Amino acid sequence: MCIRDRKLTWWKNEIDCRTFAVTKLAETWAHSLDVYDAMKKDYEDTVRVEHVALFGWLNAEQASKVNKAKYQDLRIELIGPEYKAWQFGDEQSENSIKGNASDWCRVVTGRVPKGHKLTLSTEGDFAKKFVKFNHVKI
């Protein structure tokens, strides 16, 4: 068995090692935002935020359960720092979220500042609901 396929128990859930590692990277990034906010400093994302973007997509089904919504396939298309393009999910999905990777990452880690206007566009009912979910603040 490949180690990335091994299951771990985490917060009463079983997750694979890859998802666990990506989750820990996302958590570290999110807490870095908290520190910058406390110091009233701006945080500039780098291409390493791709791991946080992947976390958001990998965690979409769990976020749906927490918000008592029926999960549907979700396509994510993002432009990251240095104009890197990142896509996750089936191209044929009826639900998609497109836009700035920084906004996506802040949504999925529960770090959208009050009054911040998101630059994400949505297509499909599930995608519209997803960006408004109460995402777990990791």
Give the predicted meaning of each segment.
Residues 1-3:
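Short, small-residue-biased leader/transition segments that mark boundaries at the very start
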Residues 58-73, 133-138:
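Charged/polar, low-hydrophobicity segments characteristic of intrinsically disordered regions
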Residues 92-138:
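C-terminal interaction segments
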Residues 11-65, 104:
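Short, contiguous alpha-helical
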Residues 38-54, 73, 116-129:
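Short alpha-helical "patches" and their helix-cap loops
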Residues 65-103:
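Glycine/small-residue-rich hydrophobic helix-like segments
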